[in-house]
């Protein structure tokens, strides 16, 4: 290789490296926590990450699984995460219980217009309607959005004397199948799949969706820390735009969303 050609090639390579480094240096890091484990709805976030939409928006996004909306709200408030996906009821509860908290998260975009929470029981238990839940033992993780909103469900349907049992998320459906609890709360799409994995057919489950039983609540929203909102609103706008692009793709091509979750 001639010296001039070598120098030209080297210069081009260095320029490309410099451009890449500059892009990496200007990328805004964002730690994002989901409300739950990696499963179907996670595709809405994992797809734009896999497709590079966040990267194209000059964002360095890290997406972690969660263990309930309440936990996500708390972690964004603590500064451990910049943004997250959480049930709006859990966010409102945090604001009500922590009026003087210096970093109360705020919602910037609705993802679920209605809460997907429901009460679920096995048909063989004899539970058919909300009235049958009075005095029964219900189970859900402490941070579960359905559990936290259950007082509204109970008031709307005259349920009294329900007792609660807490457990780790992977044990919720197992305890229902074993008969350790009479009913559970959770997001319908999550619990039905988990019950199916434990040998329970969908037709053998009584599902009482909150929106159909007097609980008119928004569902999950993207939440952000006030610190990030104040210091870098452009990054939040870029995140939401990339997210919306990913959502459109998942809706148009669900198989691509499944691949992103896998």
Predicted regions and their residues:
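Extended rod-forming repeat segments used as scaffolds/tethers
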Residues: 15-16, 42
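N-terminal export leaders
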Residues: 3-7
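N-terminal signal peptide c-region/cleavage motif recognized by signal peptidases
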Residues: 17-21
